[in-house]
């Protein structure tokens, strides 16, 4: 006799990214996987990010494709932020989010629950919050909704943040006085006690700990984030286990079950069950200049230096000039992604030497580009990067060596691992000088240093491909996360 039990309700997963492109992208990738497996997905923007997208791209950027709208919706919650707040003011963003978002997110969860009554709409079965968005976990726990958390940066960055408390206990943070912020001896303090990263120095820890304020917003927020993540049902990391094995193993002693699913974009590319409709969702406030791809088509294999410092990093006019002069004299063709707001407070005029290279067809400067496609283009032979995690994952998947110029946050931690552990990159001096830029670019493009780094980059590319393909380690973890965790309400 057949069972008369009703079918299980459709899973309804709410995803809450931090309002930054590097955070939104992996959560949207996860949304694609969930949507393709039949889940209803609610993707939550804060007003700040939503308004920035509207201003830059129009309503089409935040409207789900018609083919996906039945089970995919965008919701927006207030965050107390003005559009005048620069996106690189991470402390200001984080402080406003944690002060202002809990109440509106609570209200959203209540409303989503009330919509179920009398309608064919499933209740919320799981909340996936960015680790930075601690209010999402708090509201879910209050409502009795299972929740898991997604850390969108590197595992080594997470381990660095996890040890902020230890830095405070050992008297290293806050810095005793402002002079220590630039004291090389102090910044070189060894941190052999960090498990899985015994080669770390104080300067390699995520930079938000560099403060003299005992009540610093970013330090206190980080401590709160780590406590919240430790209490979650599970933790998703967009990393390659083989790349960060020692670090992930060290994290396992502090956090709930960890699922390494990276590079998530590559897992999606090898998956036959990622929502194609949601691939059209635009998450960038910058318009991609695709003419760079045809420009690359005309360059020899491995000849082009690709330069991009991400969606948030900024530099001074003097630093931009030194980079420009270094690229102009490096001897290789270059593609430089120079955002309109990459220079702090002023528009910088590019030097004649660089403009001459552009006029001769040996250089191209664009405001934004389809980075994953650029990195995989046969003409590209080097990536000059800020060491943001999404950029490094894309470089790993493309097998590109990296010349690093880390700017803030865990980029310094990523850089140390890149140079000392993974072996597929080298570092530029923090004080940018055109001669050093040109010299290091040449060494990476045609010297023995570059040969060594390219060989290691090729090894990591193969490892990433193996993990992401069907049956690989990251592919299997994605299947576990989606099918065994998120689609059944975060139960284990």
UniProtKB/Swiss-Prot annotation:
The organism's taxonomic lineage, starting at the top: Eukaryota, Viridiplantae, Streptophyta, Embryophyta, Tracheophyta
Residues the record lists as binding (S)-4-hydroxymandelonitrile: 23, 225
Pathway listed: Secondary metabolite biosynthesis; dhurrin biosynthesis; dhurrin from L-tyrosine: step 3/3
GO molecular function: cyanohydrin beta-glucosyltransferase activity
Organism of origin: Sorghum bicolor
GO cellular component: endoplasmic reticulum membrane
Membrane topology: Peripheral membrane protein
Pfam annotation, one family: UDPGT
Principal subcellular localisation of the protein: cytoplasm
Catalytic class of the enzyme: transferase
Family designation: Belongs to the UDP-glycosyltransferase family.
Lineage: superkingdom: Eukaryota
UniProt-recorded name of the protein: UDP-glucose:p-hydroxymandelonitrile O-glucosyltransferase
């Amino acid at each position: 006799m057949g069972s008369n039990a009703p079918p299980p309700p459709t899973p309804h997963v709410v995803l809450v990214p931090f309002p930054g492109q590097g955070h939104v992208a992996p959560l949207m990738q996860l949304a694609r996987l969930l949507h393709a497996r039949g889940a209803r997905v609610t993707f939550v923007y804060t007003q700040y990010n939503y308004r920035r997208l509207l201003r830059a791209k129009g309503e089409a950027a935040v409207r789900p494709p018609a083919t996906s709208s039945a089970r995919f919706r965008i919701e927006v919650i207030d965050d107390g932020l003005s559009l005048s707040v620069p996106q690189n003011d991470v402390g200001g963003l984080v402080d406003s989010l944690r002060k202002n978002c809990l109440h509106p997110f609570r209200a959203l969860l209540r409303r989503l629950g009330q919509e179920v009554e009398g309608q064919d709409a499933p209740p919320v079965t799981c909340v996936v919050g960015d680790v930075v968005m601690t209010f999402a976990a708090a509201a879910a726990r209050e409502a009795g909704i299972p929740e898991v958390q997604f850390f969108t940066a590197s595992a080594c960055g997470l381990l660095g943040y996890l040890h902020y408390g230890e830095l405070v206990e050992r008297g290293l943070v806050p810095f005793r006085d402002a002079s220590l912020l630039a004291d090389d001896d102090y910044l070189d303090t060894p941190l052999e006690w960090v498990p899985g990263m015994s080669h770390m120095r104080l300067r390699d820890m995520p930079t938000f700990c560099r403060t003299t304020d005992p009540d610093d917003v970013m330090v206190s927020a980080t401590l709160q984030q780590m406590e919240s993540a430790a209490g979650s049902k599970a933790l998703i990391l967009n990393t390659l286990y083989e790349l960060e094995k020692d670090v992930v193993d060290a994290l396992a002693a502090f956090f709930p079950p960890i699922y390494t699913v990276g590079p998530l974009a590559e897992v999606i590319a090898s998956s036959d069950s990622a929502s194609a409709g949601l691939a059209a969702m635009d998450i960038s406030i910058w318009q991609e200049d695709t003419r760079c791809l045809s420009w690359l088509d005309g360059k020899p294999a491995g000849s082009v230096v690709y330069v991009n410092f991400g969606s948030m990093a900024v530099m001074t006019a003097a630093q931009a000039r030194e980079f420009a002069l270094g690229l102009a004299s490096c001897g290789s063709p270059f593609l430089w992604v120079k955002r309109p707001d990459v220079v702090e407070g002023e528009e910088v005029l590019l030097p004649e030497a660089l403009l001459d290279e552009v006029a001769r067809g040996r250089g191209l400067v664009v405001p934004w580009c389809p980075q994953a496609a650029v990195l995989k283009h046969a003409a590209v032979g080097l990536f000059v990067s800020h060491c943001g995690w999404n950029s490094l994952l894309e470089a790993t998947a493309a097998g590109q060596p990296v010349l690093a110029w880390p700017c803030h946050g865990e980029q310094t931690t990523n850089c140390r691992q890149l140079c000392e552990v993974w072996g597929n990159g080298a570092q530029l001096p923090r004080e940018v000088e055109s001669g050093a830029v040109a010299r290091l670019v040449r060494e990476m493009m045609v010297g023995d240093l570059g040969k060594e780094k390219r060989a290691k980059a090729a090894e990591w590319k193969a490892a990433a491909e193996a993990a992401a393909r069907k049956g690989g380690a990251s592919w299997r973890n994605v299947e576990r996360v989606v099918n065994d965790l998120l689609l059944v309400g975060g139960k284990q």
